[in-house]
């Protein structure tokens, strides 16, 4: 997966360099953007506010989905132009489409944690023989978890049982329904959401920290991709998007409360307090 991702990120550098050579102009085109509920889309939500107040360079149709497999067919069929998706999925799609998508930006670094409803897990060794609830089958959470289990001497197919759910909200609901000793892999902000509902839930492992112990590469969780054909046919729209995207991210950093409220309004997170 790392080789695929490296190739994809190199193509991203070439894409940005190519676009930097052109001049941007305001367009009347509506750019179709797909995002997943959760951290990968938080940097995008201020595009909606910018569009509303007239500061966006163009119009955006931002659609949110609960699982990555809902976005994939839309990308392949050309029903969306740009999408925020898990990094490993971007690498897979890049290979399957022979370069039909390219990375525009890294949108999420390490946001994955192992949480427990109890006090029995204090290291990876304590996960042996346990059941782990997780979201993201076939995407970054699965690959990161399995990789780190192996690196810590645990066979993910024999030594643990991993139960996958399509959305992180399903995992948090399952955790809430379990009396004790439930273990899950969750991204932020779902960790905080789960802790708000159950104060006994605690973070036992920061998977970014664990990754850094065994890898010399940065853990990239999510990226924003564009269809290559769209980038070639609509360079002005792509340049404008990149500029608006940067403004949206800056707005998120400068106005956390306002962005949190917007995230709740559009469904990126359940509650702004998260």
Tell where the protein language model's regions lie, with residue ranges:
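Short, low-complexity disordered leader/linker segments with a strong preference
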Residues: 1-30
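Residue-level detector of short, conserved catalytic/binding motifs and their immediate flanks
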Residues: 12, 112, 222
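Short, glycine-/small- and polar/acidic-enriched structural segments
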Residues: 26-165, 182-188, 204-205
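An extracytoplasmic/periplasmic, membrane-proximal ligand-sensing/linker region
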Residues: 28-29, 39-40, 195-196, 257-274
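Structured segments of extracytoplasmic/periplasmic soluble domains
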Residues: 47-50, 74, 78, 92-96, ...
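An acidic, carboxylate-rich microenvironment
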Residues: 70, 126, 170, 258, ...
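Pocket-lining segment of extracytoplasmic ligand-binding domains
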Residues: 88-89, 170-263
